[in-house]
Amino acid sequence: MHLPFSTDSLQTPCYVTDVAALKRNGEILKSVQQETGCKILLAQKAFSMFATYPILKPYLAGTTASGLYEAKLGREEMGGEVHIFSPAYPEQDFPEICAISDHIVFNSFHQWQLHKKFVQSCGRPISCGIRINPEYAEVETDLYNPCIPGSRMGTTISPVSYTHLRAHETEADL
């Protein structure tokens, strides 16, 4: 890789970012959103170099977070939408999660039941979803299999009923 400066002057460890490449990729992502109507979010678990968020902000709809602190980072440094998912949410964090999140993914119907009153009483619309385990994996090694018994990769389809899927129309307290 050819760099436009001498690496001899760098103090290590350090990160070197190709801002031009970041902007080119951002333009591609922005055009995909414009052409399809989809929203593309930055997965902070994979890339949380928040010093680059001001560069990426014009191209993306927001961020995803796997917990309260990632959600705060996304809200404060990137802005836009904040989508949060987690195998479990500490009850004491939930008021703050509701204050900064636009979409919350729950890992089970039990979690939704536990936290829905916070969502409903937060004073602004928050969309919610349930993470469904695909119950199918290409890998044979259990260590890498997201579908093994006891997995934290969402609920299986078996407990999902028509009532769950239509809950917003049939439960008065939702």
Task: Please describe what each predicted stretch is.
Residues Y89, F109-W112, N133-E138, S158:
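Short acidic/polar capping segments at secondary-structure boundaries
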Residues M1-F109, Q113-Q120, R124-I126:
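A charged N-terminal "starter" segment
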Residues P13, I100-F106, Y144-I157:
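Flexible, glycine/proline-enriched loop segments at strand-loop-helix junctions
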Residues M49, E70, E91-D93, P134-P149:
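Conserved radical SAM core fold
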Residues S127-N133:
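Short beta-strand segments
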Residues T163-T170:
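Conserved small/polar residues in nucleotide/adenosyl-binding loops
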